[in-house]
Design a protein with these regions (language model features):
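Conserved RNA-binding domains used in RNP assembly and mRNA/RNA metabolism
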Residues: 1-84
Length: 84
């Protein structure tokens, strides 16, 4: 099964679309937006997004957080994720 299908299956089982995603450099929090006509096989679409440098997020306080209405993340860049 490909990574995006696995991601979506876990989202369905968790009964939440709120996610924290870690890449090598960023901690990303947002709501998964599942749009059938706009989804691409390799991207996770998020709304109401907050992005923080991973190094800044270790102590739980992010001094340089950025906010976005929309963010599209390449599934191949995801290191870890958790639905909350």
């Amino acid at each position: 099964m490909d990574r995006l299908k696995t991601f979506k299956r876990i989202m369905e089982k968790s009964d939440s679309n709120r996610v924290i995603i870690l890449t090598n450099h960023y901690q990303i929090k947002g709501n998964v937006y599942d749009c059938g006509e706009c989804n691409r096989d390799e991207f996770i679409n998020l709304t109401n997004v907050r992005v923080c440098n991973v190094i800044d997020s270790y102590d739980g306080i992010c001094d340089s957080e950025s906010s976005f209405d929309w963010l599209h993340i390449n599934i191949d860049k995801v290191v870890a994720f958790s639905f909350v």
